[in-house]
Amino acid sequence: MCTTYAARELAEAIRSAGGHVERLLLVRLNPAVEHKTRGNAALAVHTDLDADRALSLARETLDLARTDDPKTNPGAVVADCGPGDVPDEVAGFTVDAIRSIQDRTTATLLADTAGFARLQRGNGRGVVGALAAVGAWAALDDWTYEHITYREPDRWGTDRDVDAESVRAAADEHYPAVWDTVDRASGYPVCVPRTPCPILYGVRGDDPDACQAVADAIEGEPVARRATFVTNQGTDVHLQDGSVDSVTDASAYRVTGRVVDAPETREGGHVFVTIAGEEASAGDPAASAPQPDSESRLQCVAFEPTKRFRDRVRALRPGDRVTVCGEVSDGTLKLEKFAARSLVRTEPATPVCPTCERTMSSAGRNQGYRCRDCSTSADGKTDRPIERDLDRGWYEVPPVARRHIATPLVRGGFDGATHPMR
């Protein structure tokens, strides 16, 4: 069963039991985790219902899960405190679960130490996400929204009937308050999942009312249920600052360096580019910029599904200074976005004779250049301006390839110009 659907059902059960539901929280955890649902989601229901009664209802909700699937290991944690009053260690665990790999033993011990009740099915791995969801409100401060509609149960697993044109029209009307609803280049409605889950569509954005307005304007099959979630989607909270020589697998980073070779398109249409790390110019207090570290290298890749984003990567040249963002796997950073900080604007060229306006010829090893016609000489090559099919600023993958947790450029707050991709 879809995790958001289970949370929505739990919230309804709490209301039926006389409790007030303050909010539903949808927390995306580390996207690099191997043992996860597709989006690695953890859910929290903030309520004033008695903790013992909430625990009983959570147990009933867990019993709805498909535990015959070895990949399904749900868990629940009930914290008898306000969402912002959890121990600092629990809030810290949330951040760790978003940025690195956490184990169920640590989660179990931390929940027990805090005095939180817990439930689990299968091997107990679900307690990791459950505890992370409990700590999220205290740990995070950047929140967005998703309005999710659900299908009638007898339609689960069948093709969805959603009018794509109505999706595009509603998305255009409410952009940029609502984002990642449609991929404009392909026309694909990103808000409509391709999996056999109960979700009909989910509309994301910074304004909950706009999200619901878009959902209400979409035409298609009947909507059985709906709910608005407060989420950390579109926030880049999974990214941590790193350097070329400090990144590790299964975490995501922002890394600044210089391009060391021309981007290469390999089999499958994937585009690879390598950057060198940077280090301050030792002994030179007047140095205005970090210099390339000759030892450190980080391979980056824009996979084929990122489509036109690959053209932005192909436009990079050796010497360009960039900040790259993405998850590291097998020593390679999977590009989610990058910033062109400074661009090479010239290239070495054989000098042209100022008198004859002809290209000079080499005068011999280490002897510079000489004009064949008038013998005018030059000491070495000159800098020739080059045209760049790239501007300074941030570039991103298209909506169809964007991870739930990655920030779309249209949200703003970046340290440079942005070139949003719709």
Where are these predicted regions, by residue range?
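Structural detector for short beta-strands of small beta-barrel domains
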Residues: 249-269, 349
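OB-fold/S1-family single-stranded nucleic acid-binding modules
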Residues: 321, 327-354
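OB-fold and OB-like beta-barrel modules that bind single-stranded nucleic acids
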Residues: 252-261, 314-330, 338
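Long, charge-rich boundary regions
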Residues: 25-27, 382-422
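Long, hydrophobic alpha/beta structural blocks
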Residues: 54, 58, 62, 68-253
